[in-house]
């Protein structure tokens, strides 16, 4: 079942949110059922075997990369919510062939589309090569007055006392 266009007309934001909540809850419930079956009769959890721990390690690695495995969803749930369709969301019974591109997860600006993107210089390694004036950074210990960034004459303190005098 695939839904890629808004052929049913525009939907309110509340109805779309309720559909997404139902969709997520159904997926979460399906993932929790096998974990509950791993408990013994007296109510204590059994220790996981190595074969069961390996898929969890793979899932943790996928989670760290930002890729979450697709949760299987009943076709019945999709049929019930058929009136909800979106041009940005593809509902399908097939799993994706590959994880989402990593460049989308590396840049935090992609997640916040309302903020403007910061401009960078063409070649970062050439920054400052054609500067207007040269600057020197060194400690000056024998000055008693100086000019601040606004052009005002200021007194340079020889020592700064901190704490109670």
UniProtKB/Swiss-Prot annotation:
Any one GO cellular component localisation term in the record: dendrite
Cell compartments where the protein resides: Secreted
GO molecular function: growth factor activity; nerve growth factor receptor binding
Keywords recorded for this protein, A-Z: Cleavage on pair of basic residues, Glycoprotein, Growth factor, Secreted, Signal
InterPro entries: Cystine-knot_cytokine, Nerve_growth_factor-like, Nerve_growth_factor-rel, NTF3_N
Signal peptide, first to last residue: 1-3
PROSITE patterns reported in the protein's UniProt record: NGF_2
Glycosylation sites: 112
Region Disordered, residue ranges: 32-61
UniProt propeptide residues: 4-119
Any one of the GO BP annotations: cell surface receptor protein tyrosine kinase signaling pathway
Job description of the protein: Seems to promote the survival of visceral and proprioceptive sensory neurons.
Family named by the database record: Belongs to the NGF-beta family.
Name of the protein in its database record: Neurotrophin-3
Organism: Xenopeltis unicolor
């Amino acid at each position: 079942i695939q839904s890629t266009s808004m052929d049913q007309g525009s939907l309110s934001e509340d109805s779309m949110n309720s559909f997404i909540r139902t969709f997520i809850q159904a997926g979460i419930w399906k993932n929790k059922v096998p974990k509950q079956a791993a408990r013994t009769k007296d109510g204590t959890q059994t220790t996981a075997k190595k074969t069961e721990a390996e898929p969890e390690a793979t899932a943790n690695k996928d989670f760290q990369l930002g890729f979450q495995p697709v949760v299987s969803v009943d076709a019945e749930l999709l049929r019930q919510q058929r009136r909800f369709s979106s041009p940005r969301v593809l509902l399908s019974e097939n799993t994706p062939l590959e994880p989402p591109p990593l460049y989308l997860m590396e840049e935090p600006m992609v997640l916040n589309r309302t903020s403007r993107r910061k401009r960078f210089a063409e070649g970062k390694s050439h920054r400052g090569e054609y500067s207007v004036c040269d600057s020197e950074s060194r400690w000056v210990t024998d000055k008693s007055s100086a000019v601040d960034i606004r052009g005002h004459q200021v007194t340079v303190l020889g020592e700064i006392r901190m704490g109670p005098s």
